[in-house]
Amino acid sequence: MSVKGITPQELAAYGIHNVSEIVYNPSYDLLFEEETKPTLEGYERGTLTTTGAIAVDTGIFTGRSPKDKYIVRDAITQDTVWWADQGKGKNDNKPLSQEIWSHLKGLVTEQLSGKRLFVVDTFCGANADTRLQVRFITEVAWQAHFVKNMFIRPSDEELARFEPDFIVMNGAKCTNPQWKEQGLNSENFVAFNLTERMQLIGGTWYGGEMKKGMFSMMNYLLPLKGIASMHCSANVGEKGDVAIFFGLSGTGKTTLSTDPKRKLIGDDEHGWDDDGVFNFEGGCYAKTIKLSEEAEPDIYHAIKRDALLENVVVLADGTVDFNDGSKTENTRVSYPIYHIDNIVKPVSKAGHATKVIFLTADAFGVLPPVSRLTANQTQYHFLSGFTAKLAGTERGVTEPTPTFSACFGAAFLSLHPTQYAEVLVKRMQAVGAQAYLVNTGWNGTGKRISIKDTRAIIDAILNGEIDKAETFTLPIFDLAVPMSLPGVNPDILDPRDTYADKAQWQEKAEDLAKRFATNFDKYTDTPAGAALVSAGPKI
C-alpha cells in the first residue's frame, strides 16, 4: 500500500460522503483475501480455481453494453465528437444532457456513499507526457483487481505525486429507474463527461466497460493532439523494427503478433506519437473460450495467481472448463502484462512502426492473401475495417456475413473516423512506413488460408522480402499482389487461381466491391472521405 492514500474530503469533492473505510491501491494479496471472503454474495464473490486465478461472474452483462453508452453534449464536445445522431455513420456516441448526467451522477454517488470503498490510481498510456492519470472508485474488490491488472501500475514515487486527470465511479449495483421518462435505452448506463473528466457506470458488472471506457477517452484526446490512437496489437524485432496489427475479432491479431522472434509491446490499444508506438495498458484481456495450452501457450500460462477469470465455468473441484460457453462465448481473463515472458520491458513502448498490417478474414473468397497498399488505399481500407465470417458450419451453401468496422474499432471511436485515418497516414509518411492488407480467410477452394502460409507472409513483410517481390495488379480492387514469396504456396497468391472458373471469382469480386462502396458512402459527407472513393474497388 502506498503512503499517500486518499482522504474522505477528496471523495466528498466527487459527491461521495460518509465513507466507512477507504482501501487505497490494495496489493494483490489483499485483493485475493477481499475477493474470496465467505461473507460475499452474488457477483461480488470470487471463486478460487486450480489455476491459482480467481473467477468471477458478471451476470447478464457478459460483454459491453453499447446501447447504454452516452456522452454529455456541451460546449467542449458539441463540434468534436462523432455523434450518433449526426451524419450518415452509425455509432454508439449518444448525446446526454447535463441535467440527466447530474441525475445519473447522483445515483452513483448515493450508491457509493456510506460504503467501504476501493480506490485504485492508475495510468492509461505508457508515455508520461500524454498518459491519463485515472482514479477508479468501486465498492467491489474484484473490480479494483481488474483495473490493477489492466492499467499501468504507478510506482510509490509516482503515487506520491498522483493527481487524477479522470475519475471513474463504478456503481454496478445501482440502476436508473427514470430511464423511460429521460428517453434513455434502459436502466443501465455507461456515461462520460469530458468537461468534468468523469465516467459513470450503473447496472452493468462487465469489467470491460472500465477498460474500453478509457480507450474511448484516449481516442478522443490523442488525435486532437496529432497522436494516433489505435485498436491494434504491436511488437518489436531484435533490430528495433516495430510492427502494428489491426484486425477485428477472429482475424488473428493476437495469434500473429505473438511471435517468439519478437517482443510484445501490447495486444489491444496503442498510441503513436513523436517518440514511437506505446501501449495504453498494463495488462491483457484475452478471450478464453476453447483455450488450450497447445494452441495458445502464452495465454494459457498467464492464467495463474493474480489473473482474474470472467464468466468461465468452474467445476466442483475448482478446475476450469474452457470449452464450456454456456454462460457466454465471450469468456475472458485479465492479467498483468508481465505474466507474458516475451515483452518489452520495463515500459511497454518502442520506436516508430515501419510495418502496418491490416488483418481481414474474407469469407467471400475474393481478396488475395497479401497485398501492398498505397497511401490512399491505406486510408480507404482502414476506414472500411472489413472482415467477414461464414454464417454457419452446416454442409451446403453458406452465405458469408460482411462486417465493416471503421478503423477496425468503430465501437470505441469518439471522433469522426477520417480523423484517425489522417493521423495514422501522417505518422506513417513521416517515417516511410508501409501498409499491407493480409487476408487470413478463405479462398476459392473453400479452405481457409493455412496459418503456416499466413505466418510466412507475415515473416516476408517483417523481413522486407515482400518489398523485393515482383507484383501484379488484381482487377476491381486494384491491389498490388506479390507473384511469389518465400515459404508461401505460390498457388494461393492470386485468388482467381483458386477457382475452377475465373468467372466465379469475377462475380464474387463484383458483389463484394458493391458492399465496400455501399459501406463507404457514409464517409463521403466529409471532403476527406469523398477524396478517398477512388482508392476503393472499381465496379
Curated annotation (Swiss-Prot):
Belongs to the phosphoenolpyruvate carboxykinase (ATP) family. Mn(2+) binds at residues 212, 231, 268. Involved in the gluconeogenesis. Catalyzes the conversion of oxaloacetate (OAA) to phosphoenolpyruvate (PEP) through direct phosphoryl transfer between the nucleoside triphosphate and OAA. GO terms for molecular function: ATP binding; metal ion binding; phosphoenolpyruvate carboxykinase (ATP) activity. Binds 1 Mn(2+) ion per subunit. GO terms for biological process: gluconeogenesis. It catalyses: oxaloacetate + ATP = phosphoenolpyruvate + ADP + CO2. ATP binds at residues 212, 231, 247-255, 296, 332, 448-449, 454. Its main location: cytoplasm. CDD domains: PEPCK_ATP. GO terms for cellular component: cytosol. The gene is pckA. Its cofactor is Mn(2+). Pathway: Carbohydrate biosynthesis; gluconeogenesis. Pfam families: PEPCK_ATP (PF01293). Monomer. It is found in: Cytoplasm. Its EC number is 4.1.1.49. This is Phosphoenolpyruvate carboxykinase (ATP). Keywords: ATP-binding, Cytoplasm, Decarboxylase, Gluconeogenesis, Lyase, Manganese, Metal-binding, Nucleotide-binding. Substrate binds at residues 64, 206, 212, 332. The lineage of its organism: Bacteria, Pseudomonadati, Pseudomonadota, Gammaproteobacteria, Enterobacterales.
